[in-house]
Structure formats: structure tokens, C-alpha cells
Amino acid sequence: MDKTSINKVVLAYSGGLDTSIIVKWLQDTYQCEVVTFTADIGQGEEVEPARVKAEAAGVKEIYIEDLREEFARNFVFPMFRANAIYEGEYLLGTSIARPLISKRLVEIAKQVGADAISHGATGKGNDQVRFELNAYALNADIQVIAPWREWDLSSRESLMDYAQKHGIEIDYKKQSKKSPYSMDANLLHISYEGNILEDPWTEPEEDMWRWTLSPENAPDKVEYVEMTFKKGDIIAINGKVMSPASVMEDLNKRAGAHGIGRDDIVENRFVGMKSRGCYETPSGTVMLKARRAMESLTLDRAAAHLKDELMPKYAEMVYNGFWFAPEREMLQAAIDKTQETVSGVVRLKFYKGNVTVVGRQSKNSLFSEKIVTFENDDGIYNQRDAAGFIKLNALRLCLNTIK
């Protein structure tokens, strides 16, 4: 990349150590103006301090946006209509946040006339791929600056030294008290990587977890929760109508208090290596359980089975950074078609780390008590018909035995 061609860069900025250093590094290395963009996607931290830090770094254009509702409504909820899980365990909490951030970076870059966007993802992880693939899908001509792939800073200590050398104000007391884990949080989850978790045999310490009680310490009392669905999306909890973001915030607190949503996973990164991560996803765990219960009542068998076959591919697209790809949008259209009848109420029971479905009802239910009953069905179903059904399905099996 020709550094002289870069006059203005939009940086995905948190105000933390890494991105604070990136501001100065971009200014010095590219001799460019830096515009910062900070998104509130439910990470649970104040975002306004990022404005103060950016101003102190000489940034003139600062964007801070509350994107919680857009994140929940246009990204998380559509993904959950697919019941997407990566490698059978990961609910894609980090993966699904990247397309929205990329989208706003590209939009702001166009708005302010920037030549490039920049992010603080490392050269080893998935996020660099996700940020950039999603950005290129929206603007093929956008230039991307990834400092971790360019500079020679390789550790937290080297970052601290750089900050001290260049007069970047860092709260060293806060840094010393900072979690030893690499963390990422949003409305859907909080993730933990690094430190002792790099040994897949080592159990995480209990004080690592922030959103959930341990199941052992969760209340000895059951909580029942009713969730109302409309066309595949949750619209109310216990009869109270809520926005998508409010649904997730409510479930994070409610389910987290019962120790629901912890997971410890070794996953295959898109870049080729395996990594271990621990996740707290209270709302996602509950939503997935409730959604599958609602679909079990309202979806046709063949449609449900085909949807389940497509789900791993959909999850892989989200994980790898292909949210804006035509194949994901094609699958989304098919999935959304299946959700037209997925409306009704699911009743759940929360208790000590477990979420159990205990009831479901829908005006679109395909469940027939009259047909399935063990009692007299008044001749609706003729059991003699099963003999021909079995014989036809057994034909190929019988042929294998004929010599």
C-alpha cells in the first residue's frame, strides 16, 4: 500500500490500549487524519470515555453510535432463525458482531471521504478476516490498514512501552487490574481467550466468569419463563412485548442468574489453527432452545430436516466472515420463508444451569392430538395402512438379501 495515498482513515476504536496506540501509529506512519468510530453493541461498558481519549489524541471527527437495536434486529435475530451453531457448540457471538461494525466503517468512510478503514484485530485470528471480507463485500475499492500485520509490536509489554515513549495517556493502575484474558462482549455473549486457557486441559478459574453464576451457586428455586414468537422472532417475555435488544438484555440477566449459558470450546479458526475459548451466552442459549421447541410444533418435517442440513453451512459462512455474501443471503431468504408459521408461545424452566422446555402452543401447530393419541382416534388414522408403507420402504433392504 502506498502510504502517501492515505490522507484519512476511519478506525474501529474502543479507547483501550491497542486502539489508543493505533491512533498514534496511524498518524505517525501514514501522516494521515484519523477518524474514530466506536459502537455500542451491548458490551456493557461506557463508550463515552472513548470520546475523551480520542480528543486527547488529537482526533477531530469522532463517531459514537448506539447500535444495540440494529445489531439485535438485523443481525442476531436473522441468524437465530437459522438456529446457527458453529461446529455443534459455538453460538457465533463474536462472528455476528463484525458485519455491522464493518458496515458502519465503510459507510462512515464514504461519508467523510476517507481513503481507508483500520481495525485492531491481530494477524492470527478470525476477526481480521471477518472485518475485511465484510468490508470488501460492501466496497470493493476500500483500502484496509491492519496495524498488527505491519508493526513490530508483539506483546502487551511492548504496547505499554510504546505508549509511554509517545506520551499516550494510559491508566496503568487499570491495566494492572485488567482481566488476564482477551475478552470480547456484546449483547449476545462475552468471550474469554488466552492466558491459562491456552492449555486446553486447564479448567478456567471461577472468577473469570462475569455474566453467569456457577450452576452450583445458582438459586435452589425454579423459574418459569414464557416466550412469545412471531414469524420466528421472540417478541415478548412473560406477556411483555419487547424490542429485540430488550429481549436479549432481559434473558442475559434472567438466565445468567441461573447459571445458564457457559461453554468451553476448542474450535477450528478459519485461518487454520485451533483455538480454545470460553463463552457466556445466556440469551442465545435460551433463544435457541425455545426456537427449536417452537419449530418442532410448526414446521413440516421435510422442511425442518432440510433446514437442519443447511444450518452448518450457514453457521460456517457467518463464522468465516461471509455475512454479506450472496450465498448467505440466498440461504437467509429460504430460511425466512420457513419462519412464516413459527408463531406461538414456549414455556421454559430455568434451574441450576439448565433450561428445559415444558410447554409449547401455536395456532399453526401441526401436532394433532386426535391422530397421535393412544386412545380411540375415531378412525382418523387406519393402522392397517402402515403395513403397505413398511413393505415399500423395506423393498430395497429385502433385495439385498436375495442372492
Curated annotation (Swiss-Prot):
Binding site for L-citrulline: Y90, S95, N126, R130, S182, S191, E267, Y279
Enzyme Commission numbers on file: 6.3.4.5
Reaction equation(s) it catalyzes: L-citrulline + L-aspartate + ATP = 2-(N(omega)-L-arginino)succinate + AMP + diphosphate + H(+)
GO biological process: argininosuccinate metabolic process; L-arginine biosynthetic process; urea cycle
GO cellular component: cytoplasm
Binding site for L-aspartate: T122, N126, D127
Classification via InterPro entries: Arginosuc_syn_C, Arginosuc_syn_N, Arginosuc_synth, Arginosuc_synth_CS, Arginosuc_synth_type_1_subfam, AS_cat/multimer_dom_body, Rossmann-like_a/b/a_fold
Signal peptide: none
Domain of life: Bacteria
Pathway: Amino-acid biosynthesis; L-arginine biosynthesis; L-arginine from L-ornithine and carbamoyl phosphate: step 2/3
Subcellular location: Cytoplasm
Keyword Iron-sulfur annotated: no
Binding site for ATP: A12, Y13, S14, G15, G16, L17, D18, T19, S20, A39, G120
UniProt xrefs under PROSITE patterns: ARGININOSUCCIN_SYN_1, ARGININOSUCCIN_SYN_2
Keyword terms of this UniProt record: Amino-acid biosynthesis, Arginine biosynthesis, ATP-binding, Cytoplasm, Ligase, Nucleotide-binding
GO-annotated molecular function: argininosuccinate synthase activity; ATP binding
Pfam family, one: Arginosuc_synth
PANTHER family attached to this UniProt entry: ARGININOSUCCINATE SYNTHASE
NCBIfam families referenced in this protein's UniProt entry, alphabetically: argG (TIGR00032), PRK00509.1 (NF001770)
Family per similarity comment: Belongs to the argininosuccinate synthase family. Type 1 subfamily.
Subunit structure: Homotetramer.
Record-given protein name: Argininosuccinate synthase
Naturally occurring in which organism (per UniProt): Vesicomyosocius okutanii subsp. Calyptogena okutanii (strain HA)
